[in-house]
Amino acid sequence: MIKMRFPTLWRKWITECVGTAIASVLVNGSPTDEFPLGKGLRQGDPLSPFLFLLAVEGFRVLMEAFAANNLFIGYTVGCHDPVVVSHLQFADDTIILCEKSWANIRAMRATLLLFEDLSGLKVNFSQSLLVGININGSWLVEAATVLNCKVGTIPFIYLGCLLVGILVAWFFGSLL
């Protein structure tokens, strides 16, 4: 939050909210004495989504830096006024879009590992998928091995929605 220029007072408030929680449990229907909880966010904490957004902002900055230095080439969307999209994020779900190249695979791995080191968050590679459109299966397997993830196929689930045929064809039409 310092690097994002949050005022000292805001940082103190957030630290106070995150670090001073107490709890009590019911034992045989009677509450115990209150005890302090460990530091950090707890499941269901209303601040969690907002603090997570601050944390993953670092990923956006890393992706932007890799793209600005031509180390990562995102996917071009549109014909008349094309836009290059490198990633989409919502809450703790991220989809990374790129053209097929070993340079992109290496940059993707470097970005994700660097993000882990800088943020303290962990990327769940075992639940991550590499999905290709009109890309040779053996290339995908090799690339997924480098990324330490699984190969996915269309349809796949993103944000709880099954992305199938017409949606994927609409979004990725120029690759089909």
Give, region by region, the residue ranges found by the protein language model:
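Nucleotidyl polymerases of mobile genetic elements and RNA viruses
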Residues: 1-176
